Amino acid sequence: RDDSTKPLASFVVTEYSVSNQKNRPVMFSFNGGPGSASLWLHMGVLGPKVVKVPSDASDDGSPPYNLINNKLSPLDKADLVFIDPIGTGYSRPLGEHEGKEFWGVKQDAVVIAEFIRRWINDNKRWNSPRYILGESYGGIRGPLLVSELRSGVLTNIEVNGLLLVSPAADMQYIRFAPGNNSPHYGYLPTYAVTAYYHGKVDTDLTLLEFYENSKKFSLEKYGPALLKGTRISQEEYDEIVKEYSFYTGLSEEFVRNSDLRVEASDFRKELLRDEGFSVGRADSRYKMKDYVAAGQYPDTDASMEGFSSAYVSALHTWFSEIGVETVMLYQSSDRDLYNNWDWNSTQDQKW
């Protein structure tokens, strides 16, 4: 609600509580994106029930799906609250308000912090140890949430712990842009193990040995070479092309044409182009046939085709089993949210 108590948006969360203890730890969890709902952590890692998908990336993503008890759920140690940001899950803006009002680095942190404050107050959990767990973009949202929660003059809320899962703590290292070399040497070891998995490298090394060597090459030779820009010698350039090709399974011609800088989408398309496949983004072990092998970008994310439906279906199945009934559709992700995200809203942030 705003200062006049008019409703702005509706947060619909999933919470699990195993006792009435008012000082039992509680953990607030969310996935990243921005634009992702929390079902991935909920049904894949933390919840009392999780969906079991094959670990060898061979599944085609078709039902039925196997919903199993999660012996590793932290529910025996803490109550769990899975947060779906506005525009994801069942959380929606209300009345005349639009999702864009909540879609930004600062806006997102403010509204989720306000939800956490209200949840603590409504559930009388002011004396409970509080933990925040964020995945991917949660590496940015999490620290901002801690700051927002601590900033309240009358409702200052301290957090006992912040847990980050594969965090995107620095967007510079994952966003490809002209002049930004960071993601190129940061991604290379992932390219290397992907090429190794798909049989595109000629080596007798084990996967771990190959991975460690690729990291060494990336940090000690490839990264410094990129920083030299046009000052790099032809001899060094040719050597980098050769080694880059060896580690990634891409042709030397393609590496040259990319000027040593291959973006992730290009790699996913090029690695298995000769076979007519592209590899997955979320999990590069998955591969899927492309309709047009000559295109620049993959037709789809093969990995999401492999397991996305399993998570969505498992969540609805679980909700049905525990008596949750709604005519709303659960929004697992929202591309419109990501495309309209305000990345500049923290420029005036005071730390």
Residue spans for each PLM region:
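Asp/Glu-centered strand-loop micro-motifs enriched in Gly/Pro and often flanked by an aromatic residue
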Residues: R1-N20, N121, W343-W351
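Alpha/beta-hydrolase fold nucleophile elbow
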Residues: K124-Y137
